[in-house]
Amino acid sequence: MDVHIDNQVLSGLGTPLLVHLFVPDTVMAELCPNRVPNCEGAWCQTLFSDRTGLTRVCRVFAARGMLPGRPSHRGTFTSVPVYCDEGLPELYNPFHVAALRFYDEGGLVGELQIYYLSLFEGAKRALTDGHLIREASGVQESAAAMQPIPIDPGPPGGAGIEHMPVAAAQVEHPKTYDLKQILLEITQEENRGEQRLGHAGSPALCLGLRLRAGAETKAAAETSVSKHHPALENPSNIRGSAGGEGGGGRAGTGGTVGVGSGALSRVPVSFSKTRRAIRESRALVRGIAHIFSPHALYVVTYPELSAQGRLHRMTAVTHASPATDLAEVSILGAPEREFRFLISVALRISASFREKLAMQAWTAQQEIPVVIPTSYSRIYKNSDLIREAFFTVQTRVSWESCWVKATISNAPKTPDACLWIDSHPLYEEGASAWGKVIDSRPPGGLVGAASQLVALGTDGHCVHLATTSDGQAFLVLPGGFVIKGQLALTPEERGYILARHGIRREQ
């Protein structure tokens, strides 16, 4: 769980309020069914439910590991920054959504969305009756960690999830030491003002005495070195490191030359206060139901950390609102707003195809040479195929769609830079393939990339949507027939897409 420490100390976020998570592999498999991701980072942002907009994207660390107490549970440890309601430091909106986009060496793994309600309530319950998985020493794990971890019951009718009380038994174990523990003990004694370096016979005492003996021996050796000039430091010393090594007195004062001992002052070892606090803190875990899926997530809390203790004081704004205001609250505010935005753009692209096809007397030219000569055209008026193709393009939407990637791309602004293609099975016979990139820099646009698109035209079970960075759109039908359209976005829509993917720039 060192990744939680790194996020708490090194993330550099504007808010110290973090909810630490463990995401099981069963949840990650929903995001990326093709491989077991080994993520080292995630991009997080909050989608507001009560207003349009979202927070800036921030990067947090992530690491794959095993959840203590559940040897069969492997997954990804990470943290989620959460934000209070505007002007109300102790209130949060339970219907805000935290979006985490995971990445590994293979690229994007997927996006996980979590309601603030799950994060805050899971953290509060973990602080009150969470399962102990690490003692306060911060070095040894509790033997009670091998017992089942309590998980909140899922929604009615969902799969049953076990619930266990807090493990109160404390089991004695032989104490073990490592270098981190020794340095930690020395630091604690320094903070308490003690002069000894550990109790009798402890590794901290042995290490401290040997380090002190080495320093004193070196100091004695340096002192015994004869000096050939008062203005010089001891041989092999860095100039100025030993202080005033013998500067003569001021003129007319009759000052004498001072000779220093050459011994360097000891600097106490110091760690980040936050890092030390979280290492010394207990670790409590609590399972929560993930509202967007039937799976469970786990919230890990560190009670001795002051920033974590603040989570226990947070209250949902719905608890402080009158019943009349609650009637106007939309639980699906953020997800619904995003879905409507994606659908609206897809409908406009489909409408441009329909308009172009009507201007061509409902005929489409074969631009991809499959089997039939390219001069062949086909009439699609009142065609079941074109009706199903339009319906598929209008209803299958994603933030990984080709037109989204074309919008956020940094490719040169030329008509023939790159093509991004979505492949959709007709009649809902399978999953879609999103945002495949095809290089079309040779002149000719879609025709110039025809050799790379032959496989798309020969697939009689799929319809393909292609877009370019300059706003061109193409609908590729079975047989290589192509309908041309347009991707038109307002500056506000383009800015929202860029902000959703962590890009802030003038358009």
UniProtKB/Swiss-Prot annotation:
Presence of the UniProt keyword Cell wall biogenesis/degradation in the record: no
Entry keyword set: Capsid protein, Host nucleus, Late protein, Viral genome packaging, Viral release from host cell, Virion
InterPro entries: UL17-like
UniProt-listed GO biological process terms: chromosome organization
Pfam family, any one: Herpes_UL17
Biased composition (Gly residues): 241-257
Region (Disordered): 219-257
GO CC entries: host cell nucleus; viral capsid
Subcellular location: Virion; Host nucleus
Summary of subunit composition and partner proteins: Interacts (via C-terminus) with capsid vertex component 2/CVC2.
Protein's job: Capsid vertex-specific component that plays a role during viral DNA encapsidation, assuring correct genome cleavage and presumably stabilizing capsids that contain full-length viral genomes.
Family: Belongs to the herpesviridae CVC1 protein family.
The protein's name: Capsid vertex component 1
